C-alpha cells in the first residue's frame, strides 16, 4: 500500500507472514477484522456487476435475454437513517410503467445461466464484456437514449423487476435500511396510509391554527351570537409580515413533504415486489413474520445470487478490483450480523459514545450540569457528528482514520457545532410554535379522557441511548423497553414515601371534611347547591369540585396498606430487561439516591414534554459552549475505535464484538480486572482532588456494564439462527479464552463480577466459555432473567 495513504502505518514495513502453526496466525486467518492502520487488506471481495447490459454480449445468449440488455441504471440510494427512512419519501431511481399483473414466471423464459446473469452472476468476463459495460454506462448517463430504463423495465414481469432491482444494488447499506423500514412500517399499504395521514395531520394543524389565530374576532363573541358573526372575511390579507412568513414557511415544508411522498411511491411499490416476489413475504404477513426470518430469506437470496452490481466496501473505499477467480471462489455471505451492522453502522457509534460518556450534553450555567438529551439535540448530533463522519455513500471518511488530519477534523467539527447553534437560535421561535400547536391537538384528547396519564412515565432519550446495545435494531429495543415499564412503574410507586404519605393523609382528611359538609348541605337543601355563594361569584358546586380534586390527589399519594413493598425486587426485574446497572448502584437498591437516579432516567411524560420545549432554547447554548470542547475526544475516539471488516467496510469496533480489541474487566483475568478497577479508582480520586466540574467520564475499556457481552447475548437471543462460531468475533473470543486469566461473570440481574481466586490452567478463561455456553444454550427467545 502507498505509504501516503491514510490507512498506511508509517512506523512499520510490509508485514511478514507469521508461522502458520501459531495460534495467533490461525486466529487472524479466520478473522475478517482488519484495523485501518494495517497496511495489507484482504483482497477477497464481491465484484461489481456494472450493468446488466453486459448480458447481450455474452456468448449463446437467447433473444429473450437480449431484451434485458436495454435495462439501464442502478440502485444508487444514499445512506438512509433508520428513523427517517427513504421509503415513500425519496425519488425513485427507476420507474414502474409495467404491468404487475403479468404472472409469467421468469424461469419459463430464461435458462438457469441467464437467470444467474440477471442476478449478477456474470461468468468468464472478457474484454468484450468490459467494452459493453463501458458502453452501457455511457448510455445510462444519456437521457436521449431511446432504450431508456423505464421502457426496458416496463416489459418485465413483477418477479423479473424484483430480480433486476436486486441485481443492480450499488449501496447495500441504503438498500437494507429500506428493507428494514418496510418491515417496521408493516408493509406498503400501512406505510402509504400512515404517511398520507401524517401529511393530512400537518395540513390540518396549519389550516386550523391559521383559522383560530387569524380568522376569528374574539372580541365579537356573544352568548347569543353565531359563528358567522365572528369570522373575519379575507383574514389572510390582514396578516402581519411575521405571521405571513410563518404560514409561508409551514406551507413550503408541507409542500416539500408532499412532493417527496408522491415521488417515493414508485420505490415503495418496488420494495413491495421485492418482498413478495423474491422473499416470498406477502404484505399481509409482514406484520407478523419475525425479523430474523426476513434476514434468513435475505441470506438465502444472497447465496442463490451472490454476485450483484453491488461493490464491496473495499472497492467503494479503495477503488480496488479483485480477479474474477477470487471473486467466484470467495463469495461473501450475508448473515444477521452483517445486516445489523449495515443498518446500524451510524447508530453503533452513538451507542459507543454514550456508553463511554464522551458527549457533554449539560446546559452551561446550571448547577447540576446533568446530561440532558432531547429529540432536537439528538437530531443536531446526527447532523453535526455523523454527517461529518460519514460520506454520501454512508462510509467512514478516510480522513478520520489518519492522525495527520486530526487538527483539521477537530476544527471542522467545532465549526459544525457553532454553525448549528446559530441555525437553531434563528429557527427557535418557529419550532416552539409548531411544537405547542401540534402537542395541544395531539395530547389534549388523551389527557382529557384519562387525566391519570398526566402522572405516567417513560424513559428519556438519554436513558434509551444508555440502555441500547450494539447491533440492536430499533423495534427489538422498543420491545425490550416495553417489557420493563410495568416493573419500573411499580418500583417508582412502591418506593417508601412515608413523609409524603403522612402529609397526604392530613390533606385528605381536611379536604374530605369540607367536601362531606358541602355535599350534606346540598342534599338537605338543593337550592344551596347552585344559588348559595360561599365567596363572591363562587357557589357550593365550585368548591365541591375544588375540594374533590384535592381529595383525589391526596388519596393518590397515600400507598395502599395491603401492598408489599419490595423496591429491590422491582429494580432487579427492571435491570433484567434494561441490562443497565451502574457500578454505584450495586448493593444500594434500597437507597433513596438510586431511586432518584433511576427517576431521572424514567421520568414523567409531562416533564419530558416541557423539557422538549425548553430544549429549543437551550440547544444553541449546548452546541455553542458545551460540545465544541468535546471535539478532540470525539475525533480521537472515532479514529481509535474504527476497524475495517472485509466485505463490510469500516464500522465501530464495539459492533463487531471484538473482545480482543476492547478487553473489559469481565473478559480479562482476575488480576487484570483488579488492575482496571484500581485505575478507575485512581482516576476518580484525581478528579475529586482537582475539584473537576462538569462531566465525569468513565474509563475506556473498563467495567462499563459489560456492554459487548450483553450485546452478543442479546443478539444471539434475537437471531436464533445466527452462528457465532462462524463469525470473526468468535476467533477474538477464542484468543481471549486462551490468554486471559480465570474469571467468572454472573448474568443474574446483570451483575458482572470478576474473581481472582478462580482456578487456572484448564479452567482459564472460564468467563468466555460461560459466555459461549450461554449463547449455544439460548433457545432464541427474548433475553430474560435466565441469561441476564
Swiss-Prot record:
Compositional bias annotation for Polar residues: 125-134
Any single biological process term in GO: piecemeal microautophagy of the nucleus
Signal peptide stretch: none
Location of the protein in the cell: Preautophagosomal structure membrane; Cytoplasmic vesicle membrane; Golgi apparatus membrane; Endoplasmic reticulum membrane
Topology class, membrane: Multi-pass membrane protein
Assigned GO CC terms: autophagosome; cytoplasmic vesicle membrane; endoplasmic reticulum membrane; Golgi membrane; phagophore assembly site; phagophore assembly site membrane
Ranges in the topological domain labelled Cytoplasmic: 1-195, 257-416, 438-500, 560-605, 627-788
Taxonomy, superkingdom: Eukaryota
Biased segments, Basic and acidic residues type: 1-14
Domain notes: Forms a homotrimer with a solvated central pore, which is connected laterally to the cytosol through the cavity within each protomer. Acts as a lipid scramblase that uses its central pore to function: the central pore opens laterally to accommodate lipid headgroups, thereby enabling lipid flipping and redistribution of lipids added to the outer leaflet of ATG9-containing vesicles, thereby enabling growth into autophagosomes.
Subunit structure, interactors included: Homotrimer; forms a homotrimer with a central pore that forms a path between the two membrane leaflets.
Stated name of the protein: Autophagy-related protein 9
Protein source organism: Mycosarcoma maydis (Corn smut fungus)
Lineage, opening ranks: Eukaryota, Fungi, Dikarya, Basidiomycota, Ustilaginomycotina
